[in-house]
Structures are given as C-alpha cells and as structure tokens.
Swiss-Prot record:
<comment type="subunit">
    <text>Heterotrimer of UreA (gamma), UreB (beta) and UreC (alpha) subunits. Three heterotrimers associate to form the active enzyme.</text>
</comment>
<dbReference type="InterPro" id="IPR002026">
    <property type="entry name" value="Urease_gamma/gamma-beta_su"/>
</dbReference>
<dbReference type="InterPro" id="IPR050069">
    <property type="entry name" value="Urease_subunit"/>
</dbReference>
<keyword id="KW-0963">Cytoplasm</keyword>
<dbReference type="InterPro" id="IPR012010">
    <property type="entry name" value="Urease_gamma"/>
</dbReference>
<keyword id="KW-0378">Hydrolase</keyword>
<dbReference type="Pfam" id="PF00547">
    <property type="entry name" value="Urease_gamma"/>
</dbReference>
<comment type="similarity">
    <text>Belongs to the urease gamma subunit family.</text>
</comment>
<dbReference type="GO" id="GO:0016151">
    <property type="term" value="F:nickel cation binding"/>
</dbReference>
<protein>
    <recommendedName>
        <fullName>Urease subunit gamma</fullName>
        <ecNumber>3.5.1.5</ecNumber>
    </recommendedName>
</protein>
<dbReference type="GO" id="GO:0009039">
    <property type="term" value="F:urease activity"/>
</dbReference>
<dbReference type="GO" id="GO:0005737">
    <property type="term" value="C:cytoplasm"/>
</dbReference>
<dbReference type="GO" id="GO:0043419">
    <property type="term" value="P:urea catabolic process"/>
</dbReference>
<dbReference type="InterPro" id="IPR036463">
    <property type="entry name" value="Urease_gamma_sf"/>
</dbReference>
<comment type="pathway">
    <text>Nitrogen metabolism; urea degradation; CO(2) and NH(3) from urea (urease route): step 1/1.</text>
</comment>
Length: 100
C-alpha cells in the first residue's frame, strides 16, 4: 500500500488519538501531544461528517476539559490548527483555547 505524506500524517494522528482515547478510558490524564491528537482527530472526523468550520471550531472546545489533562497542558495549548478536507476543498480550522 502506497500512502502520500499527508495520508501518513493523518494515519499517525488517528493512531495517537486512539491511544489517547484508551488512556482516557482507563482514567489517565492526557499529556500535551495526546490532547492535541484527540482534538485534531475530532475536527478531522467532523469535517468528514460534513460539519462546517464554525461547528468544528466549537466542537474542538468540547472534546476535553481541564480535569482530563495533566497540569499545565491547558496553559500550553492556546490554539490547535488542523487542515481538514471538506466537500468544497481543504480548509484550515483553528480551535482557540480548546481546553477550558
């Protein structure tokens, strides 16, 4: 199977998000890369489902709460930017202050 670099990036992101979901299910708090992966994957899947950029910006803020991440992660994570594919093309989705 031949994958483009972009496809490899998406697959790696999905794998990291899956790991983050499993750790959350075990009651563990997520670190910075895990939190970014989970939020990014939610945005990508939402775009695939046909949601709008505005909906995804809002959705990204609902994925995690402060109690689900390690101390200091919300303060380090100001924006998450994801390049998502929509029916009308690729767009950059920015989620501001995703963990409240």
């Amino acid at each position: 199977m031949e994958l483009t670099p972009r496809e490899k990036d998406k697959l790696l992101l999905f794998t990291a998000a899956l790991l983050a979901e499993r750790r959350l299910a075990r009651g563990l708090r997520l670190n910075y890369p895990e939190a970014v992966a989970l939020i990014s994957a939610a945005v990508l899947e939402g775009a695939r489902d046909g949601r709008t950029v505005a909906e995804l910006m809002s959705l990204g803020r609902e994925v995690l709460v402060r109690e689900q991440v390690m101390d200091g992660v919300p303060e380090m994570l100001h924006d998450v930017q994801v390049e998502a594919t929509f029916p009308d093309g690729t767009k950059l989705v920015t989620v501001h202050d995703p963990i409240v």
